[in-house]
A protein has these predicted regions:
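C-terminal membrane-anchoring or membrane-association module
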Residues: 616-635
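C-terminal low-complexity, Ser/Thr- and acidic/Pro-rich disordered "stalk" regions positioned immediately N-terminal
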Residues: 555-604
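Extracellular/surface recognition and adhesion modules
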Residues: 128, 139, 158, 289, ...
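Low-complexity, Pro/Thr/Ser/Gly/Ala-rich linker/spacer regions in secreted
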Residues: 100-113, 402-411, 454-466, 499-507, ...
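Short, hydrophobic alpha-helical membrane anchors of single-pass surface/secreted proteins
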Residues: 605-616
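Acidic Gly/Asp/Thr-rich repetitive segments characteristic of extracellular carbohydrate-active
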Residues: 109-140, 397-424
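Surface-exposed loop/turn motifs in large extracellular/passenger domains
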Residues: 1-83, 89-107, 134, 150-159, ...
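N-terminal extracellular ligand-recognition/capping segment immediately after the signal peptide
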Residues: 78, 135-156, 160-172, 227-228, ...
Length: 635
């Protein structure tokens, strides 16, 4: 171990691309060592240069140099307008990972956790990958330089952590350079600057006998290469290779997206490929495309002049049955948006003769390729399509061929007034709702239902959008039926359906019974129509007279009604009413006296009381009735 104590001291190099402090061992003198750069003073130490401020190296990758910085040490660029380059961690050199140490590695820096439990920072991915105990490496800062991302001999994952890795070299930005390795790059951007540089290689060295079983996964990565090259490429002589594009974007706007001639598997999941000559081309192995994938190819087909390498056929997805290549397994296109240039098939499946460099029909394509979903810029060969939902849409002058339930539903939702859709196949259980004023053609060979309407085979018409509630077209009256129907909601459209009769009917109100009295007639309980004025009982029309309840008789006492007080016009005060007859019993102590006070009259004469005694011989006295008759006397 060595300690450099720079107490109260700063160092400056005025040389072009010079360094302030060099801690490098020669190859012959290489050994494991620890170097500590320490400022034990109270004042800040400053290391200034135009190149790296500190350079380090163990001299041999078989040996390790651990670099520590302690105290207040600042790195500066000789040109104050530029950021310092920091520490250059060379071969076998690493820096204990601390927050302050990370700031000393402004260009890149790769952090790993090693077997001793500590985290260290390396200057290159290759050095870091060989030491990572758990296979996880994290990029600390944006990187720009000529060192590619080489996987190394161990399976690992590089987390770009939102940073950009800019490769200025001329081979490939990413290289899975060992067999039996699974390598993942995630969460960031990888950019190649040279037009001769491929994006990623899974290609063995020419003298390597076994470079099989290599895997590359890009997860959440945007990989961009500028030239007429390949975004990702494998070797046709190898087996068991895997390429996975997940939530990623591959930009090769002047070249090929993915060229996969080796056996193995390609998976494109919810990713974007932008290319010129072909989006993804497989000549062996298998291919699966799922999720919201979008592949766009802008170029026209080009004549093939050599027997090897990718074919510029202009297809978004290209499946080539090629002489001398390993067997094609299965190709499944389940969803996505696939675009090729005008008059170029978006999905092509064909045979290619390497000898005469010609394309031929591939009769077995339907046994290998299956398209079950997606939206395509061109029609797809019937022998490779397998879906009971197929349609063609025309919108804004662009025609698309849509396959699969999800893709057809998405295409319908995107339609606008004036657009067109032709249904080629419709599942029996499909529920189809098309926006208003869209022209619909039924080319399915059977009747279909759209927006609740039946469309016959071959019929072309504009789709109605029906209201969810009935509209009253004619009000019913007491004597005439009315009608209601479902109307089309499209402005200016007068179409209607499901017309229903509203039966003629009275608008009845219940009228309660009015009981009869001795003064007025009553009215029976009934129903009264507020429109026509007619009255009904139990649905039978009644006249006014039929509703009447006869008046009750008066109950008179002493010439007056005990209910309403009305006088009896027939009442004669001099006549004994039957009600005034009071029967007398022999022992009735309450019987009236035989005498009545005689009221005085004007002439002073007396009232005489006649007494009549009736007797029945042999039977005895059976009763005595006393009749009192008042006689008016004058005083």
């Amino acid at each position: 171990s060595r300690t450099g104590n720079r107490k109260k001291q700063s160092r400056t190099s005025n040389q072009k691309n010079g360094y302030a402090l060099k801690l490098e061992q020669s190859y012959g003198g290489a050994r494991d060592n620890t170097v500590t750069i320490k400022n034990s003073g109270s004042k800040q130490s400053v290391l200034t240069s135009s190149g790296y401020q500190i350079t380090t190296s163990s001299g041999d990758s078989n040996y390790t140099q651990i670099v520590n910085l302690e105290g207040d040490i600042v790195l500066k660029n000789l040109d104050e307008t530029k950021e310092p380059l920091g520490i250059k961690l060379g071969t076998g050199s690493k820096l204990l990972d601390t927050e302050s140490a990370r700031n000393l590695i402004p260009n890149g820096g790769f952090s790993v956790k090693e077997a001793d439990g500590n985290k260290y920072i390396y200057g290159s991915y290759a050095n870091a990958a060989g030491k990572a105990a758990d296979g996880n490496i994290t990029l600390l800062h944006d990187y720009k330089g000529n060192e590619p991302i080489n996987s190394g001999s161990k399976s690992a994952a590089l987390d770009l952590d939102g940073h950009t890795y800019t490769y200025t070299g001329k081979t490939a930005a990413i290289n899975v350079n060992y067999p039996n390795v699974e390598f993942t790059v995630k969460n960031g951007k990888v950019v190649a600057t040279d037009e001769t540089t491929d994006g990623a290689h899974l290609i063995g060295a020419p003298n390597e006998s076994n470079m099989n079983n290599r895997s590359l996964t890009l997860d959440g990565v945007e990989l961009t290469v500028p030239g007429d090259v390949c975004g990702i490429i494998t070797n046709g002589t190898e087996t068991g290779n895997k390429v996975t594009l997940k939530n990623s974007t591959l930009n090769v706007e002047n070249g090929f997206g993915i060229y996969f001639p080796s056996s193995g598997k390609v998976t494109i999941d919810n990713s974007v490929i932008n290319a010129k000559h072909a989006g993804v081309q497989v000549c062996s192995g298998s291919l699966t495309i799922v999720g919201e994938t979008a592949i766009t190819v802008t170029g026209q087909p080009q004549e093939k002049t050599d027997a090897d390498g990718p074919i510029a056929d202009g297809a978004a997805v290209s499946i080539v049955n090629r002489d001398g290549y390993k067997k094609l397994e299965t190709v499944n296109i389940e969803n996505g948006v696939f675009n090729s240039a005008a008059d170029v098939e978006a999905v092509r499946a064909y045979s290619f003769n390497n000898a005469d460099k010609t394309e031929n029909e591939w009769s077995e394509a339907g046994n290998v390729v299956e398209v079950t979903g997606g939206s395509f810029s061109s029609n797809i060969a019937e022998n490779i399509v397998n879906s009971d939902m197929q349609a063609t849409t025309t919108s804004g002058g662009e025609t698309r061929f849509v396959v699969g339930k999800t893709a057809v539903e998405n295409a319908i939702q995107a339609l606008k007034s004036g657009d067109k859709i032709t249904f080629k196949k419709v599942a029996d259980d499909a529920v189809i709702t098309v926006p208003e004023n869209v022209e619909i053609t039924n080319s399915t060979g059977k009747d279909i239902t759209v927006n609740g309407d039946t469309f016959e085979v071959g019929e072309t018409t504009t789709a109605h959008v029906w209201d969810t509630e009935y509209t009253i077209d004619k009000e019913a009256t007491c004597t005439e039926d009315g009608s209601k129907s479902i109307h089309c909601t499209t402005p200016g459209c007068t179409a209607k359906k499901d017309v229903q009769i509203i039966p003629a009917a009275h608008k009845l109100e219940n009228v309660a019974e009015q009981q009869a009295t001795c003064k007025a007639e009553g009215i029976k309980a009934h129903q009264h129509c507020t429109v026509c004025g007619k009255d009904f009982i139990d649905g039978v029309e009644k006249t006014v007279d039929e509703l009447k309840i006869t008046k009750l008789a008066h109950t008179y006492v002493d010439g007056k009604c005990t209910v309403c007080g009305e006088s009896d016009s027939n009442y004669n005060p001099g006549t004994m009413n039957p009600e005034q007859m009071i029967p007398s019993q022999p022992n009735d102590t309450n019987k009236p006296d035989n005498r009545m006070d005689n009221p005085e009259t004007g002439d002073g004469s007396n009232l005489t009381l006649p007494i009549i005694i009736l007797s029945v011989s042999g039977i005895g006295l059976s009763g005595i009735f006393i009749y009192l008759r008042k006689r008016k006397c004058n005083r």
